[in-house]
Amino acid sequence: MAGSLAARGITVEHISRDELRFSMISDESEYFSKEKEVFSKFVEKMNNSLNKNDCTIIDATHISKASRAKILRRVENPDNVRLLVLYLTTPLDVCMRQNDLRTGRERVPHEVIEKMAKQFEDPTEKEFTGFGFDSVEVWEKPWKEGEI
């Protein structure tokens, strides 16, 4: 997504919570050991990007309303910025196949993905009310047939 926007001349910053985390740890066993620092850096990068780029993509799996509310309370929304939530409804089997294509630290154990899928709470427009979001869009099929 970031690549296709950039190809159209739109300045894009893609902020991945996992990439930030992996830059701060040396071993997978430390995955959540620096969560406070990861979250702080994630919020800092998000707000800096909202102020300087045409498009900021916040890449993180916020599976619960509570985890989404935690980040929403920290969004510093400049007046001229349109905030949009993209909810990508990727089926579990597609997530598993995509994950199987990953290597090293990026690959997530299947049991973790299955646990997250069971705990997932669908986002609603109501939960974003009051945070300055313009809309919540649901993308039913955010991948191309035969791609995965």
Regions found by a protein language model. Name each.
Residues 33-88:
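Glycine-rich phosphate-binding loop used to anchor ATP phosphates in small-molecule kinases
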Residues 14-15, 82, 107:
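Short hydrophobic/aromatic-enriched beta-strand-loop microsegments
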Residues 28, 32-39, 61, 106, ...:
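Flexible, glycine- and charge-enriched loops at secondary-structure boundaries
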Residues 4-11, 90-148:
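Conserved GTP-binding G-domain of TRAFAC-class P-loop NTPases and closely related GTPase folds
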Residues 2-5, 29-30, 70-74, 99-102:
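Short, glycine/charged-enriched secondary-structure capping and boundary segments
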Residues 2-54, 94:
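Conserved substrate/cofactor phosphate-moiety recognition/catalytic segment
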Residues 18, 58-59, 99-100:
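Acidic side chains
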